[in-house]
């Protein structure tokens, strides 16, 4: 089965992202807006308990942190994707790095660019038209992230939460 690790932002930020995703993201119905921390990876059922334990350990080792969206950007020419760019933060990078150490395989295709996808698989014309329009908008949002999620993929291609892990040491 396929698994992944992501963080889901607050409802206001998800609503803002979805206002674009419903039109520009063919994966809109498969998963809510999220920040991918670990690309999809395959696990056998007997491997799941040790992975859950490791994700829990990683989450406990990273304190809650600010998530700041500050502009719209694109991965063009690598891919015709539009996204809300997220300001880098050491805790976010730490989570990403830890989720790419043993027992996890390094399966990332690209270097880590914190972002929230709002459009993908766009034609060049769609990308350039929308990028120009969206760059004129003032996109500014900040919130505190205090949890991450282990997800699994259903047979229909959609993703659902397997378990949620609170960041930082429990008091």
Swiss-Prot record:
Keywords: Hydrolase
Gene3D superfamilies with a match to the protein in the record: Cyclic phosphodiesterase
Active site: 34 (proton donor), 115 (proton acceptor)
Intrachain disulfide bonds: none
Motif (HXTX 1): 34-37
One Pfam entry name: 2_5_RNA_ligase2
Family: Belongs to the 2H phosphoesterase superfamily. YjcG family.
Protein name listed in UniProt: Putative phosphoesterase BH1439
Protein species of origin: Halalkalibacterium halodurans (strain ATCC BAA-125 / DSM 18197 / FERM 7344 / JCM 9153 / C-125)
Higher taxonomy: Bacteria, Bacillati, Bacillota, Bacilli, Bacillales
């Amino acid at each position: 089965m396929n698994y992944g690790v992501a963080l889901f932002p607050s409802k206001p930020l998800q609503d803002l992202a979805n206002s674009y995703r419903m039109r520009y993201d063919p994966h809109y119905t498969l998963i809510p807006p999220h920040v991918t921390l670990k690309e999809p990876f395959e696990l056998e059922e007997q491997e799941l308990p040790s992975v859950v334990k490791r994700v829990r350990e990683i989450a406990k080792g990273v304190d809650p942190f600010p998530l700041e969206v500050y502009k719209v950007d694109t991965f063009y020419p690598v891919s015709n994707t539009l996204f809300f760019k997220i300001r880098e933060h050491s805790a976010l990078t730490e989570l990403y790095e830890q989720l790419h150490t043993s027992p996890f395989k390094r399966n990332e295709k690209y270097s880590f660019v914190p972002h929230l996808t709002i459009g993908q698989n766009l034609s060049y014309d769609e990308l350039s038209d929308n990028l120009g329009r969206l760059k004129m908008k003032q996109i500014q949002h900040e919130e505190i992230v205090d949890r991450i999620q282990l997800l699994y993929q259903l047979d229909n291609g959609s993703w659902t939460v397997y378990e949620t892990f609170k960041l930082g040491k429990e008091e």
